[in-house]
Amino acid sequence: MTDLIAISGVRHAYRTKAGPLPVLDGLELSVPEGRFCAVVGPSGCGKSTLTRLIAGLMKPDQGEVRLEGRRVTSPRRTVGMAFQNPVLLEWRSILDNVILPLEIVAPRMPRAERVARAEELLDMVGLAGFEGKRPSELSGGMRQRASLCRALVHRPSVLIMDEPFGALDNFTREDLWQTMRDLRARERFTCVLITHDLRESVFLGDQVVVLSGRPARTQYVLDVDLPEDRTIDILYDRRAGDMLHLLRDQIRIAQGRDDPPAHTGSDLLPGSAAQGLTTPGAARDAGGPGGAPDGPARKTAPDGATRGAAR
Amino acid sequence: MIRKVAVPVAALALFVALWELLVWANGWPDYVMASPSDLPQSYARFWGLFLTGAWQTLWRTVAGLALAVLFGLLLGMIMGFSRTARDGLYPLLVGFNAIPKATLVPVLALLFIGQHDFNTVMMAFLISFFPIAVSVGIGLSTLEPEYRDILRSLGASRFTIFRKIALPKTLPEFFGALKVAVTLAFIGTNLVEIVSPHGRGLGALFLSGQTNSNYPLMFAVLIALAVLGIALYYAVVALEKVFAGWAERPQG
Ligand SMILES: Nc1ncnc2c1ncn2[C@@H]1O[C@H](COP(=O)(O)OP(=O)(O)O)[C@@H](O)[C@H]1O
Ligand SMILES: [Mg+2]
């Protein structure tokens, strides 16, 4: 299977009044076709910047972003995007909001066909019957569902989501995770999900990428070795618990906290979960002082991180 | 619905009654202050002049406002999309807006001698484009980037993004400004009509009332202006309901 998304050696800095602000430095990411990649990292580390690079809304200063084997230089119609703010257009009905991308991507598609496609999706996310409503008449969770439908209506090969469930309450959020899982089972797309919720990343992700603090590099990659048809209960399973602990430790490292982690990786990672660990970032760190950029992780990287690489 | 009509009508009746009472109680003759009961005669006598005057005032106001909308939208778009343009144009605009427009009457009259219609439309335009330009500029420049990105990430052109998202999204601000602009344009038209010798429109009718010491006629013109102003304002409100009605939140 080829990597649908391949990012290598990406560096990027914003030009600000106070001089260049390096945001990404040494970002590596590869997502095989059809896989779900969850990205976590400290706030302000450059996650949204990463989504904009993948979507072709910006070009990196250095390195390359490839989508479907081709280098990304400008936006592509095979991408769908969803944000924390559902950004529905208040002057359009829910149905017409969902149809919007088709007006750009398939201007000659007959209206009936567009409507049929939109209704199919709205039905899948449980919004059947709400087609004619205005966005302001819907709850936050329902708006986010509509936003997901809009992101998927033109059958993109990549869905990019930037903290889409971040503003929702816990139970609504868990409902949406399940909706997301069901959508994936029905539609084929590769997914990049930015989140600050570790449970979300483990529930939805096939892999979880931990970014370091700014400037972000790929600090850690966790392969989530759980069955495809997950239920919320799986988060209370020991394997998921171990992964959550491990991710928590990685986040602590990414934040550059010096206080020692409450758990050491070794007693928390019995066989099964540890098998799936790969960590390119850690591998580079382990390579000694050979030019790897200084990240906060180097000082405090615990056994857990390097051990995964050694396997 | 009944309340919506009954309340303003009652307020109007009360206002007219108080006016009549005030004039009657003070025993003012009609060359000091006309009373509402003097007005019907004026309307009856000069009805033809009122109709032509109102028409002239109306079309010149609307023409000036239409120019203001076109120019204001254009300027607003330029300021909304380019920071440099915004920084450069803003002080100019504010300065221009600060000039008392009465001073422009002689300037315009000298620039375009004898072009009374043109001068009037120009004044209505000059006085009213500012709020439109500013509100459209601010509306566009404060558009959240995500709104742009949902279409930009599909490779949509700037124009498509403007047409499908930025423009409709700024319509509520635009109509807010248009309500201010329509009143300003109306004032601009009347200003020129009243100040110019040989003017036309309701303003000229007012002037002739003044030169002939026909005070009831002057008051009748003022009332006619108020009615026309209200009609123009509510025409904009009706347009707003059609094009930006979605922005109205149901009141709970
Ligand atoms: N357009 C921009 N210009 C300058 N700085 C920016 C811009 N966008 C984001 N930044 C800065 O870059 C850093 C990373 O931003 P972002 O990618 O949004 O982080 P995250 O999504 O991980 O919170 C932040 O410190 C932010 O303030
Ligand atoms: Mg962000």
List the predicted regions and their residue ranges.
Chain A
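Helix-to-loop junction immediately C-terminal to a conserved catalytic motif
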Residues: 55
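Conserved ABC ATPase "signature" region
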Residues: 106, 111-130, 182
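Conserved ABC transporter NBD signature motif
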Residues: 63-75
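Conserved signature/switch motifs of ABC ATPase nucleotide-binding domains
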Residues: 133-136, 154
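Catalytic Walker B motif of ABC-type/P-loop ATPase nucleotide-binding domains
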Residues: 159-162
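A short, flexible loop at the N-terminus of ABC-type nucleotide-binding domains that lies
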Residues: 1-4, 13-26
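The feature captures the beta-strand-to-loop junction immediately N-terminal to the Walker
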Residues: 40-42
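Short helical segment in ABC ATPase nucleotide-binding domains corresponding to the A-loop/adjacent helical element
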Residues: 95-105, 115, 119, 223
